[in-house]
Amino acid sequence: MAPKGWPLLLESLGWSDPELWWSHWQQRGGFELARRVWPADVKDQWLLGVALPLLSQAESLLQMGGRPLLGLSALPGCGKTTLCDWLVHASSELGWSIAFLSIDDFYWPGPELDRRMAGNPWGVPRAIPGSHDLELMATALDQWRETGELLAPRFDKSLRDGRGDRSEWVRSTPDLVVLEGWFVGVLVSDQASEAENIHSLALTTEELVYRQQLFRLVPDYAPIWNRIDKLWHLKGQSGTSSRLWKRQQVETQAKTTGVHVSESAVQDFVRMIETAFPAAWLQDLHQSDVVIDLTNQRAVREITLK
């Protein structure tokens, strides 16, 4: 069953008749398109309500030309990396050239990253504002748009005992780039800050002080967000959805790769996600074009357009 708002999304992508849209994708493989990328238990509703419409968005942007940048924002553990990986493989099968970048690829090199993350109250080695080389990110995106060549670093989170480091540089010539991250599109909102229930978070003095430092860094990301042509937001049921999703992600990672993350590290990371920003900053992205509301089980509840 298609989620609420799905027909309007298709219409915004140039498909007024959902049956014609479905026929279009059935001829290209439908749910079997790049199926190998998905976990065995992927739901058809996810493919119908999220994956194939996102592929349609990419197709629409490619038809417009100009080397478009498609943004994808979602809390950690939501499945956005797998979604982007599928998008690249599906596009390749269709003969399109699409690449995806995470803002995490632009973390500072190890020693500089350690310096910038020192003293944060959650003890996280990365992920928060200030951990990214924004000048490098802007340069990589701008040079790609000007020349067609994308040169970007990759970050391996398993290096340096889990603190991570740059591992390689990748050169490609995509016609479209997807930029994903857990706070892509987040902007400072005084109104949301005022509405926040500080007491319910039980913020420590250290957290209160440090998050003000983060708030001052958030505007530095706006020039990157402004480069995005279309922004999709996979919105969790609440600001605490990542608590469940991250644990599931860590469990899956341990089973598939043998890499284990300590319980304390998971707790620190989740605490950071829940307290680094007011929840409304993550839940209500003013620049988003498509919002897909998800349950804690990652089922699509509703799709809205902005």
Which residue ranges define each predicted feature?
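Hydrophobic positions on the alpha1 helix immediately C-terminal to the Walker A/P-loop
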Residues: 83, 87
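Post-Walker A helix-loop "phosphate-sensing" segment adjacent to the P-loop in P-loop NTPases
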Residues: 89-99
